[in-house]
From Swiss-Prot:
The keyword Coiled coil belongs to this UniProt entry's keyword annotation: yes
Subunit structure, as described in the record: Homododecamerizes. Interacts with terminase subunits TRM1 and TRM3.
Protein name stated in the entry: Portal protein
InterPro entries: Herpes_Portal
Protein family membership: Belongs to the herpesviridae portal protein family.
Gene Ontology biological process terms in this record: chromosome organization
Assigned keywords, A-Z: Coiled coil, Host nucleus, Viral genome packaging, Viral release from host cell, Virion
Organism expressing this protein natively: Alcelaphine herpesvirus 1 (strain C500)
Membrane spanning residue stretches: none
Name of the gene encoding the protein in the UniProt record: 43
GO cellular component terms listed in the entry, alphabetical order: host cell nucleus; virion component
Cell location: Virion; Host nucleus
Domain of life: Viruses
Role description: Forms a portal in the viral capsid through which viral DNA is translocated during DNA packaging. Assembles as a dodecamer at a single fivefold axe of the T=16 icosahedric capsid. Binds to the molecular motor that translocates the viral DNA, termed terminase.
Length: 557
């Protein structure tokens, strides 16, 4: 084989299912949601667009806007010479404040529109691939021109608010072009889900290949897996957690099975009763023939003897049998007058005690052994028939072409889970204990294996693995409780860097700095505006036009 399957395999699919919370989802895993949150990426987009937009204007444009604004204000308000300094300052302050508010509103609306566009490259899927396999399949496609045109129409509605300002118009046109270019790039990249794509590794070319809808697409390697001897071992965080997650899940599953087995409606061990067997034999003999049969009478004698456990009982049974049979015999001594002859009952006693009793006892024992074997075979075949009937009934209930519905014993209803367990080798049925056998072990105890400690350990392990693997920084309150986590600069280099430059192709886009990771768009705008080219121009114009008035002088006048 020249290629090795990387995904989908049992190992890789299992890692994605762990991320989705299918196995032993604990509190520590919620930390992963902070990693895959796309807010940090969009803050980076906002930062670059905002900074570049403010740098697009020129000093001449800003100066002309100020002169135009100041002239219109003076035409409406004619201050005295004493009030001229304060008038200049208030006019200048209202001008640059309204300009900043307009810029913030337009750029924030543009970024909000981009964030809410559903057809852009998914940052969440990118993080899922990095956390599981370490490789990311990427599909290059045509930009969604319809989305871009709708975005431009959305921004054109704001043009009326900036049409009177030359500098704001310049910023607005730059924003439309820059944001449209970003949106085109975001819609030209697609990261498929793990159910839609297959990834292989070419051993000869030493490169990864992916297939999506029968098309070959590119693969970006973030954390290279270890490949050798036809096997793939992922070096991802979830791979390191997988064994502990599955161990905790299996323990929880075991506990659930114990709970289900211990909540059965009725549980009993049935032992066959000898009296019941003997009665069945007698009824069978009665049905076979109603005539007096010597074998039948002797068999009845042996059965009654077996039922009696005391000496007196045995004596009474024998006496009754001899009396009953003796009444049917002809007494020749009375008939022919032979005084010395023995009574027939005496001869009968001797015959019963000697030959006939021994022979019939052996025969009856053989018959009982045969009956016992037949009962075992009957129980075995009844069990098989019940299983076949259950399978047939399920097949009849399911529509054709559909497979069996998988059930989860942790989440299914109790009755459904019990029914599923009955078909999985854990039969909740009663079995007869045959003669010669005894119970050497029982499972009547209400034992449920503990799993809380495993869950707590797994919770801490998730936290440590996520924090250390992605270099996250915790935000703690005054009581020492962690409120949330944020990206550090190392996290940005490790996750945002490849996504921005390698996958999306924003080569000129600067990475976000750590201080902006948890700030709102308006807070970021405050910092960016204070260090922008536009702010420098405005400060220079303000210093040349007016100085901040002395409030004490103004109050004295």
């Amino acid at each position: 084989m020249c290629s090795i399957a990387v995904h989908p395999t049992i190992q890789s699919v299992n890692l994605f299912e762990i991320l989705q919370g299918k196995y032993a989802y604990v509190k520590g895993q919620t930390l992963y949601s902070s990693v895959r949150n796309s807010g940090t990426f969009f803050r980076q987009v906002f930062t670059n667009i905002y900074r570049d937009a403010l740098s697009s204007c020129t000093y001449e444009d800003v100066l002309q806007d100020w002169i135009k604004y100041e002239t219109s204000i003076r035409q409406r308000w004619k201050p005295s010479e004493k009030e001229d300094n304060a008038f200049k300052w208030s006019t200048f302050q209202s001008w640059f404040s309204t300009m900043k508010m307009t810029i913030d509103g337009i750029i924030t609306k543009a970024i909000t529109y981009i964030i809410n566009t559903k057809c852009i490259a998914s940052y969440e899927r990118y993080i899922d691939w990095v956390a599981t396999c370490g490789v990311v399949p990427v599909l290059n496609q045509r930009p969604n021109s319809k989305v871009v045109q709708m975005f431009k129409k959305h921004l054109e509605k704001e043009y009326s608010s900036v049409a009177s300002s030359k500098s704001l118009t310049t910023i607005f046109h730059f924003l439309v072009e820059s944001a449209s270019s970003v949106l085109e790039r975001l819609t030209s990249k697609f990261i498929p889900s793990y159910l839609e794509v297959s990834v292989t590794y070419d051993q000869y070319k030493c490169e990864y290949k992916a297939s999506y809808q029968n098309k070959e697409i590119g693969v970006e390697v973030i954390i290279p897996p270890t490949i050798g001897s036809g096997k793939v071992v992922f070096n991802s965080p979830v791979q390191r957690l997988a064994e502990n997650v599955m161990a905790c899940h299996r323990t929880m599953e075991h506990a659930k099975i114990c709970q289900l087995l211990n909540t059965g409606p009725l549980k009993a061990i049935v032992c066959s009763s000898s009296a019941t067997v003997y009665k069945d034999i007698l009824n069978h003999l009665d049905e076979c023939g109603k005539k007096n049969d010597p074998k039948k009478e002797l068999m009845q004698l042996l059965i009654k003897l077996a039922e009696n456990k005391t000496v007196n009982g045995v004596t009474d049974v024998v006496e009754d049998f001899i009396t009953d049979v003796s009444n049917k015999l002809v007494d020749r001594s009375k008939l022919f007058g032979d005084v010395n002859a023995e009574h027939p009952s005496d001869n009968l006693k001797k015959q019963v005690s000697n030959n006939v009793f021994k022979c019939l006892t052996q025969q009856i024992n053989q018959q009982f052994e045969t009956i016992s074997k037949l009962e075992e075979e009957r129980a075995f075949f009844l069990k098989k028939i019940n299983q076949i009937e259950t399978q047939l009934s399920k097949c009849q209930e399911e529509p054709q072409g559909t497979g069996g519905k998988p059930y989860n014993i942790l989440t299914s209803s109790t009755l459904d889970a019990l029914d599923g367990l009955s078909q999985s080798g854990l039969h909740l049925t009663s079995n007869q204990v045959t003669k010669g056998q005894s119970i050497v072990n029982s499972f009547f105890s209400q034992y449920v294996p503990p799993f809380r400690e495993l869950q707590n350990d797994l919770h801490e392990l998730w936290e440590h693995e996520i924090m250390q693997s992605f270099n996250l920084s915790p935000i703690i309150d005054n009581q020492g409780q962690r409120l949330f986590v944020r990206y550090t600069q190392d996290t940005i280099f490790f996750l945002l860097g490849p996504f921005t430059h390698n996958i999306l192709g924003f080569v000129d886009m600067e990475l976000l700095i750590e201080a902006y990771c948890t700030l709102s768009f308006y807070d970021i705008a405050e910092y960016l505006y204070s260090a922008s080219r536009l702010a420098i121009y405005i400060v220079d114009i303000g210093q040349k036009y007016c100085s901040q008035p002395n409030l004490s002088d103004g109050s004295q006048s």
